[in-house]
């Protein structure tokens, strides 16, 4: 295994001495330099593999990168070399936006958690697509998911317009498209998870996808990312709505607004979505309920609080077909990818 994998625990104190968002940027820039120098070429080959079928696609393994780490699709190739079975980038909005004021990302180390209120900060669809089309990841067999959202200044009643623009833009370049309706950092966005609102949005996206599928001679799977802060009744309504509108998969889950697991910790009162270890059990409950409701009709990608191979296994056992990592990478480093794949491979024997 590359020395850079083993060096992350040594580098972490220096990174954690920085502002969380600055450390994020420094880490991505360092990874890109390592990729450009050829240092990362062996990483992918060093990782255990576990071929997995997901929504008709063949993944090298069922451990993916969650959206949010690379919002602008600028580091796809470098991230793809860490051994992920699939990579998801975004969320991208039609127009560039700066997001919420800084500071807007906070670590809670005692809980292996993170709070962010970034607010879909990104360079916009045109810049995003320029980065995606420059990437070689897909041409080398990688599976790429592109995550779309709405601009903060788009009225919620016009949200479908932004998603339709996003879908049309990313469609030719995506192996699957994720519709992000669950970030807590865009005002009223989670209202789109309601039955009527969700049904109207998905009906519009379904019709647009049919048009794009004919135009591009291929049907790209459509996935919806949902929140963990849902009642069982709400989960059932969402599941039924996804099924009735021809959606292919669901990502469970996004960040939580709950602070029950981190009360009293520094930064716990900050506004934003909480990710990391405290989300694991919440995500498991949503996955279990979804699987009970949809049977095998929908693919489920489990995300939230995976900091070990065992927790990846628990997501799969709860009903997920694949998993994604984000905050766990901040606390554990890139070695977490191989650990999760290895654990799942051993479980499958």
From Swiss-Prot:
Keywords: Cell membrane, Flavoprotein, FMN, Membrane, Oxidoreductase, Pyrimidine biosynthesis. It is a peripheral membrane protein. The keyword Membrane applies. GO terms for biological process: 'de novo' pyrimidine nucleobase biosynthetic process; 'de novo' UMP biosynthetic process. It catalyses: (S)-dihydroorotate + a quinone = orotate + a quinol. InterPro entries: Aldolase_TIM, DHO_dehydrogenase, Dihydroorotate_DH_1_2, Dihydroorotate_DH_2, Dihydroorotate_DH_cat, Dihydroorotate_DH_CS. FMN binds at residues 67-71, 91, 147, 180, 225, 253, 276, 305, 326-327. Pathway: Pyrimidine metabolism; UMP biosynthesis via de novo pathway; orotate from (S)-dihydroorotate (quinone route): step 1/1. The active site is at residue 183. Pfam families: DHO_dh (PF01180). Its EC number is 1.3.5.2. Substrate binds at residues 71, 116-120, 180, 185, 254-255. It is an enzyme of class 1 (oxidoreductase). Its cofactor is FMN. It is found in: Cell membrane. GO terms for molecular function: dihydroorotate dehydrogenase (quinone) activity. Belongs to the dihydroorotate dehydrogenase family. Type 2 subfamily. Catalyzes the conversion of dihydroorotate to orotate with quinone as electron acceptor. Monomer. This is Dihydroorotate dehydrogenase (quinone). The gene is pyrD.
């Amino acid at each position: 295994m590359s020395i850079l994998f083993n060096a992350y625990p040594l580098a972490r104190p220096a990174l954690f001495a920085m502002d969380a968002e600055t450390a994020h940027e420094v880490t991505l820039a360092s990874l890109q330099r390592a990729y450009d120098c050829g240092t990362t070429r062996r990483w992918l080959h060093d990782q255990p593999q576990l071929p997995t079928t997901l929504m008709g696609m063949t993944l090298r393994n069922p451990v993916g990168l969650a959206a949010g780490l690379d919002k602008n699709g600028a580091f796809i190739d470098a991230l793809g070399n860490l051994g992920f079975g699939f990579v998801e980038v975004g969320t991208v909005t039609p127009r560039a936006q700066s997001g919420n004021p800084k500071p807007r990302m906070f670590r809670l180390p005692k809980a292996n958690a993170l709070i962010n209120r970034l607010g879909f900060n990104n360079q916009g669809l045109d810049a995003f697509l320029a980065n995606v089309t420059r990437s070689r990841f897909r041409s080398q067999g990688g599976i790429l998911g592109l995550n779309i959202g709405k601009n903060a200044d788009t009225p919620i009643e016009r949200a479908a317009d932004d998603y339709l623009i996003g879908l049309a833009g990313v469609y030719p370049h995506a192996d699957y498209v994720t519709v992000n309706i669950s970030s807590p950092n865009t005002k009223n966005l989670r209202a789109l998870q309601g039955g009527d609102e969700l049904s109207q949005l998905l009906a519009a996206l379904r019709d647009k996808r049919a048009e794009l599928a004919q135009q591009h001679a291929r049907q790209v799977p459509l996935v919806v990312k949902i929140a963990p802060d849902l009642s069982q009744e709400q989960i059932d309504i969402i599941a039924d709505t996804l099924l009735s509108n021809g959606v292919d998969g669901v990502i469970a889950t996004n960040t939580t607004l709950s602070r029950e697991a981190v009360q009293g910790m520094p930064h716990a009162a900050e506004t934003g979505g909480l990710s990391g270890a405290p989300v694991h059990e919440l995500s498991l409950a949503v996955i279990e309920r979804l699987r009970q409701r949809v049977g095998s009709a929908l693919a489920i990608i489990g995300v939230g609080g995976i900091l070990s191979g065992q927790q990846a296994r628990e997501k799969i056992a709860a009903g997920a077909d694949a998993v994604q990592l984000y905050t766990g990478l901040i606390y554990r480093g890139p070695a977490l990818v191989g650990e999760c794949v290895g654990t799942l491979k051993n479980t499958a024997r």
